[in-house]
């Protein structure tokens, strides 16, 4: 995860996003059982991919810019190029993007995917905890992001899950992003490090002490940190309403 997240809209069809892991390492197989790989068919008929994470046996969280005509979720995967016995492939029944999501500003870049059936919880497939609405991660904290995205600006996407350590930055570090909003977004990745999420990682989680605090959203086209992640805590009340079917 070295590269910065870039607005997928600029590189992929607008229905799908993709950021990658640059400067990271291969994850221990199945050590992140909440990770989801999304195969997306766009409205134009192209195929794209995003990351996501299981927050409930029937709901996966991802970025709103990963929306497509159809999405299939693969859970329990390490190497997405192989048919692993741990994998569960489930089609998405409903894509629920946040009602205030803006394609132009990329604010409220969060979406819930309701699966056609509940995932079977196993050693390789499990949910991850979310923060409380008042839980704000502070600058200086080191968290991790994971995904199957590119391992470099000119490199292909990775078949195997990779992860990277990223530092939470102050809002001043993201001042050059015109629409950055500290209340709803997290500034992630030290400019002094060649580490980030990049194309293919969009929608994946930012995990701090075992809790999903952010969602890979966007960054610079040259993958230079910091990048912008959606902050999850302000959306917890909305998330709970969606899961309850309200």
From Swiss-Prot:
Disulfide bond entries: 50-66, 143-208, 174-187
Propeptide segments, given as residue ranges: 19-20
Enzyme Commission number: 3.4.21.-
UniProt-listed SUPFAM superfamilies: Trypsin-like serine proteases
GO molecular function, one term: serine-type endopeptidase activity
Enzyme class: hydrolase
Family per record: Belongs to the peptidase S1 family. Granzyme subfamily.
Active-site residues (renumbered): 65, 109, 202
Name this polypeptide is given: Mast cell protease 1
Keyword annotations: Disulfide bond, Hydrolase, Protease, Serine protease, Signal, Zymogen
Signal peptide range: 1-18
Domain Peptidase S1: residue ranges: 21-244
CDD domains according to UniProt: Tryp_SPc
Keyword hit for Membrane: no
Xref: Pfam families: Trypsin
Gene Ontology cellular-component annotations: cytoplasm; extracellular space; intracellular membrane-bounded organelle
